[in-house]
Amino acid sequence: MFTLKKPLLVLLFLGTVSLSLCEQERAADDDEGEVIEEEVKRGFMDTAKQVAKNVAVTLIDKLRCKVTGGC
């Protein structure tokens, strides 16, 4: 029985180490996904702001044209 304890402990240790490494790698992958998602959201908001700004400028130009009467 004693001769089987050491190999079993070594296998248990190696399994624990490999499991720990897998969890760290998975956590690193999860962090990268959040960063990419945040960048996509930021890119969408910047695009929406730019479109709103362009629409506002166009409307102001048309309003100014109607008020002054000369275009």
Curated annotation (Swiss-Prot):
Any one Gene Ontology cellular component term annotated for this protein: extracellular region
Signal peptide range in chain numbering: 1-22
Prodomain residues: 23-40
GO biological process, one term: killing of cells of another organism
Keywords, ordered alphabetically: Amphibian defense peptide, Antibiotic, Antimicrobial, Antioxidant, Cleavage on pair of basic residues, Cytolysis, Disulfide bond, Hemolysis, Secreted, Signal
GO molecular function, one term: antioxidant activity
Cell compartments where the protein resides: Secreted
Pfam families: Antimicrobial_2, FSAP_sig_propep
Tissue expression per record: Expressed by the skin glands.
Disulphide bridges: 65-71
Biological role: Displays broad-spectrum antibacterial activity against a range of Gram-positive and Gram-negative bacteria. Has low hemolytic activity, low cytotoxicity and low antioxidant activity.
Family of the protein in this entry: Belongs to the frog skin active peptide (FSAP) family. Brevinin subfamily.
Protein name (database record): Palustrin-2AJ2
Species, as recorded: Amolops jingdongensis (Chinese torrent frog)
